A protein has these predicted regions:
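Short, basic/aromatic recognition patches
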Residues: 12-39
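Generic structural signal for secondary-structure transition and capping sites
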Residues: 36-37, 82, 123, 147
Length: 162
């Protein structure tokens, strides 16, 4: 997955007047692969935000996370798939906008990739799903539409559009 457009985020005058570099997309994908906690923001029907930390993995250009369909965030995603994700750091920033939806039962090949990625990242935290973990549901996929990233707010804020 590669962005179709790379530009600058829009800021009010005086915020970031002379950025001198860009964040490479490879840096963003590295952060997506290595980050342990992703902050998922969905919305209630009345527009109030609902934010929750999620464990997630970045596989084949998409972000996958899992959980019960009965959780509040899962119900919100079904009601309104437009969500944001923010990675752990407030300094090395990656903010994503896109859509999330139930992924359904993954193919055997994809399930194997997902299980391996989860095991590599979260076994030390007590979570190591097997490939059949999502046969009955509980897997969600986030598709990136826009990303904003920076490693230094004043010099390299970068916007990626897909």
């Amino acid at each position: 997955m590669k962005p179709t457009k790379i530009t600058r985020p829009t800021f009010p005058p005086g915020y970031v007047d002379n950025p001198t570099s860009e964040v490479p997309w490879d840096y963003v994908t590295q952060q997506l692969t290595e980050s342990k906690n992703y902050w998922l923001c969905s919305v209630y029907p009345d527009g109030r935000p609902h934010v929750i930390p999620r464990w997630a993995i970045f596989v084949d250009g998409k972000i996958y996370y899992d959980g019960s369909s009965q959780t509040r965030h899962a119900r919100k995603v079904v009601e309104n798939p437009h969500v944001s994700l923010h990675l752990e750091s407030g300094d090395q920033v990656v903010i994503l906008e896109g859509t999330a939806r139930p992924a359904g039962k993954p193919s055997r090949e994809l399930a194997q990739k997902l299980a391996q990625a989860y095991q590599a990242k979260y076994t030390a935290h007590g979570y190591a799903p097997e490939p059949d973990q999502w046969d009955e549901g509980g897997l969600y996929v986030f598709t990136i539409q826009k990303a904003i990233a920076w490693t230094n707010f004043l010099t390299d804020p970068t916007k990626f559009v897909f």
